[in-house]
């Protein structure tokens, strides 16, 4: 695509997309489809397209995948050339060449880096891999020429950008060496604590290649060059063609240099596959990182455009930092350290010349404009059962000058001056000038815009990856030494004695008090399970969020074909182990280093172990099990932070904690039914301090601190400890468990059962009582040894502290932090002048925030005294705290990744749009892209830019990435291949008779699939407005014909391999239950399983089999429950209700296994591949037959029509609290009002708490959706005695009488709303969560004709219309409107009668009631004869016609606060 094509075809269409209002939305979307089609053709080569006459939005697009080297190389050279031309298009030469000298210096530095073989041991073990040359430029050039001159099959194993099949290439060839002077390769020694010699050898070339691949790969889901092209295109459109990227200029000059003037060689030496994977890096080590820097930098400029508005100074600062990073790709940590304290103490200096000027000075806005909350008092502690914001108004003045002077102390000034000097020392003069702007107080959003802009520069490196072993050792070794010194201090007045004197009794008392409250029934809804309940409900303890439990891999022979299968399902892991998950006999209580373990073996045993290791008969994980060692995993973060360790817990320890302390965790999660009595956690009283009590996914959790920052009357004190887990000693944790044990011992019945865990070494009584389980776990946690492994290097670490994979990590960290905070508050009150009083506090694991009434604070000495008290106390309690990071501020703060300033809230721009932290676990490309859609949605809702632009950007990227690979043998090759390549392809296919070659094609589903809702198989559900995913109503009202034109095709996109393997496995394990096989449809479309071999990364896993899980589940069935369930099933049959066998209680073991197998994923390369028959079928369908019916997937939307009425008289001057939102989000907040009061408990599509509680209480695997479907499809409610029928139904699947009665009452009391996939609307999790979305507030934007419909149904329509209004507001350039809902009268009568159980109360409201539609004039009368009575005197017949889903209202009842 030439620059002229982009300028003449793409630019105007994108402008029309972004500037058109509602009246032009259809044409705008057609333009979007055309742009996508053009970009896809450009990406794949229009001459490679098959059936190019087809409508791409109806049938999709098919391309031959290029595999011939020269053709592929030329195409990529063309893509890069187009990118460079686009960058230079209509840009002055002076602008283009402005930084050429610097860029030339960067390229020269790369090509003069030390050679790979010159790296010494210190280099290769450094945290960040040093820069080095992989080969000389001459060697690279010669290799490229040689590579392109060889036949496609002449080099075995060479990677290819299009990932073509290389498995059958000729072996008799010479491999091209992509590293210069391989003869200089040498052996390097890696530390290995699992080796008898404590070291292992590998080659230098292998090790650095592995590190390069592991640490540089951004894990994209698409190739970066099209992403660069799209990003630059949008930047050009927004700036009228002026945008210019010096990152792309660097790419251009580099490609010109290394190609030596040959256009076909002018491609970037970091090679990516079409799926975004980094395939190889040539010539120089850090090219992949530089590609990441360039793409991320351009993306931040585009998506956070409102922070800079493309002003010259900001763009110059951006370019300066980008060029610095390109020159110093490992320099991100230095840059981050240079501005660390500026990031904490920005906007803190009161400057009368600027702060009170109320005007713009040197381009900086000093107007005073932020929300204030006058209703909030800080004279007494704030003790409330639920945190929420109070009403706000605009603040235009500043009146806390004395407090300003106290906070901005000499110490703080020195911090800031030092950071500015560090930036200057990095030779970044423009950034230095920018940071100087961040010092003075600015009570408006502009300072937040500036701090976020600076943080985008810190985050352009994406996810940081480094040498895990080096990073772990850098922290763990020093802290282990510190801990050992602490533990060895036995003096009476020592640090250990002082802490144990006050903390351990408090820990024990808290553990005792909370346990006692739970056992006495004071914590409503929380209880200790019996031993039998624990086993029956094992699924509730092993959830997807059970960190630290190993994953499962297995090899499956299905129909003679071997599949490598993986699953991250914790349930699958449990099912493979069976009852062994409760057996502690295999867990060593004396973990050892290997060297220590060997001393316990005699010579013969040592030799046997040596031989087994040498012959690979014993794997690493088995050796770790023998030594009692656990595994350390890792996770990456952004902003160049070191990799963090994740300590993997063994399953037995996890379950023991679930039984012991799980109820405590449950007692501190969610709103407390008993209001707190005081600030502090005592055990008997939970207090107000646990963040988990108030967390709802919004900033409500710290609303009091945010409001206080606008008052000018309070101080926020923020404690930031480093490596909290490693300094939280096990010795400090055990007293809490001892308190639990004491309470359980006193409460005799709680310790009367002995089957929680097993110890097979005890011959008399195998089972363990709960107190015995506590003793075992306390002994277990005293000392562990964890082993970290990275690219062949392995280190074992002694751990006598909290480890991150434990169930109780967050809870116990919060407990200790709360106790320390209480102690600090007492000390501040008693020792600091003026006795400042704490009015509110909160802890979230290792984060703590305290808010003090500052009326008595007049000097910096008082502030410094508070800081010293905080630092001294945490230090005395064995934690590491940096005084410089202990922020005390009257206007700003950061806690648990929530930032605030002067009553305004914002987020760090750390979410990455392009990169992934980990390799996707999705089973197919549709799931991958749906995951990307969710990431893009999350990214865009906090990006300070245009939501319309950013949403379009995400859709364009997804359109190019959403492709399916299809391979077929040559005799199935696609017809209609272009003649230009036909003869060449035929020649290649016949060149070597002994090789089976393939025709490989790439299929793009209909382009409308990107916005097609996910209720359609191939739909991604991406957002048009940015408000929500799956925008069904908007599509229905504005774009229905376009989306439905190819809907039938989109709904046939499927991936069979995973399903075939999982179903075949299920049939294998059900081979003795032919009735279940037939009912589940496993008798067709499956293949015989010949063999299964299990493996796991968990040290507790020595062997496994799903047969173990089935046996364990069958044994755990309660005989009494089984009898009840069978009786209920028989009663249901007697009235004609037949339940699917898989849902009955007696078949629960099999349904559990079935659920485990649904999450398996087979060979990675198949996740993007489908069978050729499907694509042939899709292509053969006439366009006229591709049309589908979207509303049939979402039938609720067929009940009504929405009409928009423009309304310009709405109030639009509400103050703005949420700054990290797009421009449209702030406009909506100004229109609707900021989030205020208690909002409804919206968690999206999920479940009514009563139904979820029933499922969890009974350990069921059925989902809430399936349970409701079962209630509906069984017809149990539409017969006589519907309540009793439901009791029998729930008893048949659970065997539990009490919970079945409770759930039946819940249903019949009309509390649930029928769930189906009809409503896909989210308030929480979208930018609308920032607005006051209470029904009393939003009703002014909605009108509904049928005003006498039941209140809950009216609420549903109100919220649908409200979201639709917000979508229209965004797409119509922030034009306010009102949405008028008219009900479809033909369906209203059936809907009202059939949507729910009809109680007597509802009957009284319904009989003879007239429902009228003001527009149509139609009146519907419902008389008593239309409702037949039943034998149940309380309820009437329900004839289910249509299930209704209202997920976001499920916690509401009439009259509840909105």
Swiss-Prot record:
Q: Write out the entry's keywords from A to Z.
A: Host cytoplasm, Nucleotide-binding, Nucleotidyltransferase, RNA-directed RNA polymerase, Transferase, Viral RNA replication, Virion
Q: What class of enzyme is it?
A: transferase
Q: InterPro entries, alphabetically?
A: DNA/RNA_pol_sf, RNA-dir_pol_reovirus
Could you name the domain of life of the organism this protein comes from? Viruses
- Taxonomic classification: Viruses, Riboviria, Orthornavirae, Duplornaviricota, Resentoviricetes
- Belongs to which family? Belongs to the reoviridae RNA-directed RNA polymerase family.
Stretch list, region Disordered: 148-168, 971-993
Return one GO MF term: RNA binding
Gene Ontology BP term (one) = viral genome replication
Q: Which residues form the RdRp catalytic domain?
A: 686-894
Q: Name one GO cellular component term.
A: virion component
Key word Transferase present: yes
* EC number from the UniProt entry: 2.7.7.48
Q: Which reactions fall under this protein's catalytic activity?
A: RNA(n) + a ribonucleoside 5'-triphosphate = RNA(n+1) + diphosphate
Protein name as catalogued:
RNA-directed RNA polymerase P1
The listed locations are:
Virion; Host cytoplasm
Say where the protein is mainly found. Answer: virion
Describe its function: RNA-directed RNA polymerase that is involved in both transcription and genome replication. Together with the capping enzyme P5 and protein P7, forms an enzyme complex positioned near the channels situated at each of the five-fold vertices of the core.
Where composition is biased (Basic residues), the residues are: 979-989
